[in-house]
Swiss-Prot record:
Localization annotation: Cytoplasm
Listed pathway(s): Purine metabolism; IMP biosynthesis via de novo pathway; 5-amino-1-(5-phospho-D-ribosyl)imidazole from N(2)-formyl-N(1)-(5-phospho-D-ribosyl)glycinamide: step 1/2
The protein's name: Phosphoribosylformylglycinamidine synthase
Chain residues that bind ATP: 322-333, 402-404, 706, 911
Function per UniProt: Phosphoribosylformylglycinamidine synthase involved in the purines biosynthetic pathway. Catalyzes the ATP-dependent conversion of formylglycinamide ribonucleotide (FGAR) and glutamine to yield formylglycinamidine ribonucleotide (FGAM) and glutamate.
Organism for this UniProt entry: Homo sapiens (Human)
Organism taxonomic ancestry: Eukaryota, Metazoa, Chordata, Craniata, Vertebrata
SMART domains: GATase_5
Record's catalysed reaction(s): N(2)-formyl-N(1)-(5-phospho-beta-D-ribosyl)glycinamide + L-glutamine + ATP + H2O = 2-formamido-N(1)-(5-O-phospho-beta-D-ribosyl)acetamidine + L-glutamate + ADP + phosphate + H(+)
UniProt modified residues of type Phosphothreonine: T619, T623
Enzyme Commission numbers on file: 6.3.5.3
Segments forming domain Glutamine amidotransferase type-1: 1064-1302
Active-site residues, as the UniProt record annotates them: C1158 (nucleophile), H1297, E1299
Length: 1338
């Protein structure tokens, strides 16, 4: 048995917000607590016979410790408990290796520590009390300190990672021939197969006809592959509603929407992703992805891909992990479109129950409601699910650009409770694909079956069936634990690079077919991949993360980050080389046979070689699965569902007498569906990839309000795609048809603010979340589907894909609590010009902006199901509706024409919160007042202002006002002039009148504070409260940033000379890097010859750096930053002899430069290339293979979380060659990092660096001065330091991302005169590097 070594690490004094949150949570539960001390323990599985040598121990201690300290790691614990202390150790469940362990092991291997095969991290706490703590105190502390779904308590230090007991084989037969249906019923119960009575009868009869018993693995396989989750029985079934047989299935009805829309789908209803006809674009790609090579410009037809799905059950059980794997699964859906596609950007949405935030009263939340123990509380879902989705996207490198968040917990008039106990975690994704890769090839005998991605773990066994249980909570809790998955974005990123290499292969894509692994695991994905030809699969050929896995687990576990593909044998070497270069496992697990059967051979005892030869087994090898594909995947009898409508009990809305507009706003503006989503947008990357033209945040204060997300199809073009969301589930409690129409209307009134090719080109993903098999709900879903189909036919848009989740109910005690029926519409389309987008922020204060209101259901002011009703714990009777779809068609057309002619300044849709909220949000985002008068006689004020009838509010300038009004009115639309903008600034007044009577008059900053309050309350629970309070105070007073280009600033221009000199720069990336493509674009735009180089290339000797003048160390999360920011990357450079020598030689050459951004900045600091003692020789790095003693490190942001901000920086004087001529400029730039706080080894060193101009970049406040104010300084670095350079100026390390702002359309906000720039000032940084290389400087 391998020994487990323990390395204890004490806190270094700057650990982010987590310890503070932990302390506050503990003190809230244990008032008698007097003190908390913590340490980490790295539990290292050491497989060598001898214990680590002194040198190996030194490496391990360097990896685990802080390089600025010498004594923070020990082999014995730092925490020695006294008699009144409680010592607790918690960490991950040990049933499989965590992603953290996987990445640490990768680092260890890169540094020559081969005997390390597992490293799990535990947290240790010493809690001090005045008296000896009781067992009850220990139980409370343990419950507070760990997540029972993914973690466990360790009463003693870990001594072994070997499981205490081996799982049962579970390969035996189920005795249907002897016991009939009873045998299958027993297996159904024991394995949690979620088979209903129809399934039990069907499979019993089938195996009796075959005259054989199914194996346990086959029964499990059938349950997963044919679960509601996978087969969509309800949508494809025969429905009877109130005794009437529906002519078409719901799926057929949805497909019929294609008949009234333009035929621009190149893929629809397949692959979990759809695609529409795109455009010809120019783009960069490496010449040869199997080796280091230069980027070259190519041109081709790129289509737009979209997919959306939900991950509700796992998120309800374990919010963080469920959301990470939901995001990862949807990313794989995009990857696996056709024969491989490009991931570009994501969307996210969350629906949860009443939050019950401690100390924050939301009057509509009922404190008497009880919550089940097997689901996370809504507050945990709101924070941790969004943390999980954000963390996965951040580390993978996919920006999240749009979304929604909604809460509901309400008792209906009939006594029924409706709440999202089982939450919604929605994930959408937009991507692109080459036209040549649309169609998958049919499987042919002899094709190789390959699994690419992470090894097999005992994760998510039974997830597909578990999520199909009719009412969540009816399954056993053990099986709920088994269905939880955990994500590894680092592995997914490596897998994505393998797929992208195939897609970009110069001699053609070797992938014949590609499918992502999800519900049902290998059993499902390998059947889909091999259908209809059939395949033989061998268990010995899978890479196992756990040798104790049985055949059922190998076949059925939903371990994440895995895809399956087919390729022809001649392309085997290509895939092998790419996988090795990207360090991503690729396992050739079987072969297409052509016999139309799927056969799993368990040959682990006696492996069968690839050529079919091998040692003769003593007995025939077991085949846990041997099924005819037609029998499993072929057309099966439709299930019939007999449904009854159950009309809701209605009560008129009864608002308090004399309720003022301000009093109503005090509630409505704090409702999660209406309130600011800043707590979501600030922690998720919105710029990575460099293809983002419009993300959520708009205006001078970056207010999270954008209606539409826009991306480019290439860095080189203004052609792109737009997507927007629509969902109105609360209205479904009154009328599901209305909710469906409004979801479509909301998606289109959001999308309308981006210029698209044509309304009839718009396609939609429809995602249905409903408790469809409970009384009344299935009929409601059918009605909603009918209404959606009808309104889409009238509008000319169509559905081309989607998913369903039909078990949206949970058991709470003896009560079944259903979620509201929900339809999420994701509309998407091609953008011919990504710059022709309008945002909601008012842009022309001081009365220069005129406000227009286009009502799409004129004369209607219904309050049923609105935010106002919900805030008074009611629904009301009559919901708003899209009464005249033709109005939306005309309004869409007119608005698009105005965008094309650049006649609109801003625009926003009327939705949650009504007209008054729409107007206020535009003022909030523009940071200015407004003065409006709504002329609607004979209607009460609250109905006029808070009805959520679909509509648009627009800002136009005086010269264009008459023309805009005329265009709408000539189209027969109801277009009212409401008023104009007011003064600028947070103290400007908002004055709202109805029919001439003033009903609201308050400073915009005060109203905005109400709107931001719920978000800041949630933020205090996920970030350092002092930082949150600082941002909240700042928003009340800020005017907005001021940018500055001094007169001496060079006039940046794109080098145009054909055939001119192109210095060579290496875009160097490591495992987990994700900022390489935008970096390549920036250097290419500046005239460099740009090369794609990996650390593996340097380690293997595939290339050296002698011919390169520059190296760019890119952003991302190398090795997921598991040991600290860029620590793994620094270890690979320091301890790998070949790679380290190559980089040392490069640095010593006087004709070279380097740029480190974000993760690259963290790396250069660790290596000592920047930040060392200015008085020492900068060319010396110390002896080979010895870590540098850095002068500074990049540590956790003071906020304690990842920060995504559009911040300002000031360029100062100094020797940095890349910033020459830019001194004095104050420019906005993307910031996206979790560890950017510059920790200097001493105040003296900081003073020397500042005095010598070696910190040439500082975070700037709104006046352009260096600042430590949060969030203007997003990480809290002392003195506002944002960048460091070497003494000779050749090496520059910066935390912000100038490479994501080299094109004007990449900017998040451009005030005059920057809004007319055709070239971004940030391009000058890269041009400076080129100019320096051409000068021949040494």
């Amino acid at each position: 048995m391998s020994p487990v070594l323990h390395f204890y690490v004490r806190p270094s004094g700057h650990e982010g917000a987590a310890p503070g949150h932990t302390r506050r949570k503990l003190q809230g539960k244990l008032p008698e607590l007097q003190g908390v001390e913590t340490e980490l323990c790295y539990n290292v599985n050491w497989t060598a016979e001898a214990l680590p040598s002194a040198e190996e121990t030194k490496k391990l201690m360097w990896l685990f410790g802080c390089p600025l300290l010498l004594d923070d790691v020990a082999r014995e614990s730092w925490l020695l408990p006294g008699s009144n202390d409680l010592l607790l150790e918690v960490g991950p469940r040990l049933n499989f290796s965590t992603p953290t362990s996987t990445n640490i092991v990768s680092v260890c291997r890169a540094t020559g520590l081969g005997p390390v095969d597992r490293v799990e991290t535990t947290r240790r706490y010493r809690l001090s009390f005045a008296h000896p703590p009781s067992a009850e105190v220990e139980a409370i502390a343990l419950a507070t300190l760990h997540d029972r779904m993914t973690e466990q308590h360790f009463p003693h230090p870990i001594q072994s990672f070997s499981p205490e007991s081996m799982p049962e084989p579970l390969n035996g037969p189920i005795n249907i021939l002897g016991e009939g249906r009873l045998a299958l019923e027993k297996a159904n119960q024991e394995l949690g197969l979620a088979l209903d009575s129809w399934d039990l009868d069907f499979y019993t009869k089938r195996f009796q006809e075959l005259q054989r018993n199914p194996s346990t693995v086959e029964a499990f396989d059938l349950a997963q592959s044919n679960s509601e989750h996978s087969r969509h029985w309800f949508f494809k079934g025969q429905l009877h509603v109130d005794g009437q047989k529906l002519v078409h299935s719901l799926f057929e009805s949805i497909m019929s929407t294609q008949e009234s829309s333009n035929p621009n789908n190149v893929l629809k209803f397949c692959d979990n992703s759809s695609a529409i006809q795109g455009k010809e674009v120019r783009f960069l790609r490496p010449e040869d992805p199997t080796r280091p090579s230069r980027f070259q410009q190519q041109q081709g037809l790129r289509h737009v891909v979209f997919t959306a799905e939900t991950h509700n059950f796992p998120t309800g059980v374990c919010p963080f992990s469920g959301a990470t794997t939901g995001t990862g699964g949807r990313i794989r859906d995009v990857q696996c479109t056709g024969r491989g596609a490009h991931v570009v950007a994501g969307t996210a949405g969350y629906c949860f129950g009443n939050l019950h935030i401690p100390g924050y009263n939301l009057p509509w939340e009922d404190p008497s409601f009880q919550y089940p123990g097997n689901f996370a509380r809504p507050l945990e879902v709101a924070i941790e699910a969004s943390n999980g989705a954000s963390d996965y996207g951040n580390k993978f490198g996919e920006p999240v650009l749009a979304g929604f968040a909604r809460s509901l917990g309400l008792q209906l008039p009939d006594g029924q409770r409706r709440e999202w106990i089982k939450p919604i975690m929605f994930s959408g994704g937009i991507g692109s694909m080459e036209a040549d890769h649309i169609s998958k090839e049919a499987p042919e005998p002899g094709m190789e079956v390959v699994k690419v991605g992470g090894p097999v773990y005992r994760i998510g066994v039974g997830g597909g069936a578990a999520s199909s249980v009719q009412v969540q909570g009816d399954n056993t809790s053990d099986l709920d634990f088994g269905a939880v998955q955990r994500g590894d974005p680092e592995m997914e990123q490596k897998m994505n690079r393998v797929i992208r290499a195939c897609v970009e292969a110069p001699k053609g894509n070797p992938i014949c077919s590609l499918h992502d692994q999800g519900a049902g695991g290998n059993g499902n994905v390998l059947k889909e991949l091999s259908d209809p030809a059939g395949a033989i699969i061998y268990t010995s050929r899978f890479q196992l993360g756990d040798p104790t896995l049985n055949a059922l687990e190998i076949w059925g576990a939903e371990y994440q980050e895995s895809n399956a593909l087919l390729l022809r044998s001649p392309n085997r070497d290509f895939l092998t080389h790419v996988s090795a270069r990207e360090r991503c496992p690729a396992c050739f697990v079987g072969t297409i046979t052509g016999d139309r059967r799927i056969v799993l051979v368990d040959d682990r005892e006696c492996p069968v070689r690839r050529n079919g030869q091998g040692d003769a087994p003593p007995t025939p090898l077991p085949t846990p699965v041997d099924l005819e594909l037609e029998w499993v995947l072929g057309k099966m009898p439709r299930k019939e569902f007999f449904l009854q409508r159950k009309p809701p009990m209605l009560q008129p809305l009864a608002l308090p007498p004399g309720l003022s507009v301000h009093q109503a706003l005090e509630r409505v503006l704090r409702l999660p569906a209406v309130a600011s989503k800043r707590y979501l947008t600030n922690k998720v990357d919105r710029s990575v990839g460099g293809l983002v033209a419009q993300q959520q945040c708009v205006g001078p204060l970056q207010t999270p309000l954008a209606d539409v997300a826009v991306v480019a199809l290439s860095h080189e073009e203004l052609i792109g795609a737009a997507t927007a969301l629509g969902e109105q589930p609360v209205k479904s409690l009154l009328d599901p048809k209305v909710a469906a129409r409004l979801a479509v209307a909301e998606a289109l009134t959001n999308l309308v603010f981006a210029l698209v090719t044509d309304l009839r080109d718009v396609k939609c993903s429809g995602n249905w979340m409903w408790a469809a098999k409970l009384p009344g709900e299935g009929a409601a879903l059918a009605d909603a589907c009918e209404a959606m189909v009808a309104v889409m036919a009238a509008l000319g848009v169509a559905v081309d894909g989607g998913k369903d989740s039909l078990s949206m109910a949970a058991r709470v005690g003896t009560e079944t609590v259903r979620a509201p029926g929900s339809l999420v519409i994701s509309a998407y389309a091609v953008c011919p010009d990504i710059t022709a987008t309008v945002t909601p922020d008012l842009k022309h204060p001081e009365g220069r902006g005129h406000l227009l209101y286009v009502a799409l259901s004129p004369g209607q002011h219904r309050l049923g199901g609105t935010a106002l009703a919900q805030c008074f714990s009611q629904l009301g009777e009559h919901p708003p509706d899209l009464d005249l779809p033709e109005n939306l068609v005309r309004a869409f057309s007119i608005t698009q024409g105005l965008l094309k002619d650049r006649l609109l300044c801003s625009g926003h849709d009327v939705s949650d919160g009504g007209l008054v909220t729409c107007l206020l949000e535009m003022a909030f985002a523009g940071n200015c007042g407004l003065q409006v008068d709504v002329p609607v006689p004979r209607v009460d004020v609250l109905s006029v202002l808070f009805a959520e009838e679909p509509g648009l509010v627009l800002e136009v300038q005086e010269p264009d006002l008459a023309q805009v009004l005329k265009r709408y009115r000539d189209a027969g639309l109801h277009c009212l002039e409401l008023g104009h903008t007011g003064e600028a600034g947070p103290h400007a007044m908002v004055r709202v009148s109805v029919n001439g009577a003033v009903v609201l008059e308050e400073p915009v900053g005060e109203l905005r504070a109400l709107w931001e309050e719920t978000s800041f309350q949630l933020d205090r629970l996920q970030a350092e409260p002092r930082c949150v309070a600082e941002e909240e105070r700042g928003l009340r007073e800020r005017m907005g940033p001021s940018y500055c280009l001094p007169p001496t600033f060079p006039k940046a221009s794109v080098p145009r000379e054909p055939g001119g000199p192109s210095p060579r720069v290496a875009i160097l990336r490591e495992e987990g890097s994700n900022g390489d493509r935008e970096m390549a674009d920036a250097f290419h735009l500046a005239g460099f010859e740009v090369w794609d180089v990996t650390m593996q290339d340097l380690c293997s000797g595939a290339i050296g750096l002698d011919t390169f003048r520059g190296v760019a160390f890119v952003g991302g999360f190398s090795y997921a930053d598991v040991l600290g920011s860029a620590k793994g990357w620094a270890a690979a450079v320091t301890f790998h002899p070949r790679a380290g020598a190559e980089l040392r030689r490069f640095r010593k050459r006087p004709d070279t430069f380097s740029l480190g951004v974000c993760n690259g900045c963290q790396l250069l600091a660790l290596l000592g290339w920047v930040g060392g003692d200015p008085n020492e020789d900068a060319a010396e790095m110390g002896p080979d293979s010895q870590p540098a003693r850095p002068g500074l490190l990049l540590r956790h942001n003071l906020s304690g979380r990842y920060e995504s901000r559009w911040a300002s920086v000031r360029v100062g004087p100094g020797p940095a060659l890349m910033l020459r001529g830019m001194e004095g400029a104050v420019l906005p730039v993307w910031s996206a990092h979790g560890e950017g706080y510059v920790a200097f080894s001493s105040p003296e060193l900081q003073a020397q660096i500042e005095a010598r101009g070696l910190a040439p970049l500082h975070w700037a406040d709104d006046d352009g001065n260096p600042t430590e104010q949060y969030p203007l300084n997003p990480n809290g670095s002392p003195g506002g330091v944002a960048g460091i350079c070497s003494c000779d100026g050749r090496h520059l390390a910066v935390m912000p991302h100038p490479e994501r702002a080299v094109r004007p359309w990449q900017w998040a906000w451009r005030p005059p005169p920057f809004d007319t720039l055709t070239t971004s000032p940030w391009l000058q940084l890269f041009i400076n590097a080129r100019n320096w290389t051409l000068e021949g400087s040494c």
